[in-house]
């Protein structure tokens, strides 16, 4: 659903931020 899509996007963004902040 729409809420699920948002949650997925947020998870992807958080993962990318985690990767960036590691470097």
UniProtKB/Swiss-Prot annotation:
The keyword Cell division does not apply. GO terms for molecular function: oxygen carrier activity. The keyword ATP-binding does not apply. GO terms for cellular component: extracellular region. It is found in: Secreted, Extracellular space. Its main location: secreted. Transmembrane segments: none annotated. It comes from the Eukaryota. Hemocyanins are copper-containing oxygen carriers occurring freely dissolved in the hemolymph of many mollusks and arthropods. This is Hemocyanin subunit 4. It comes from Carcinus maenas.
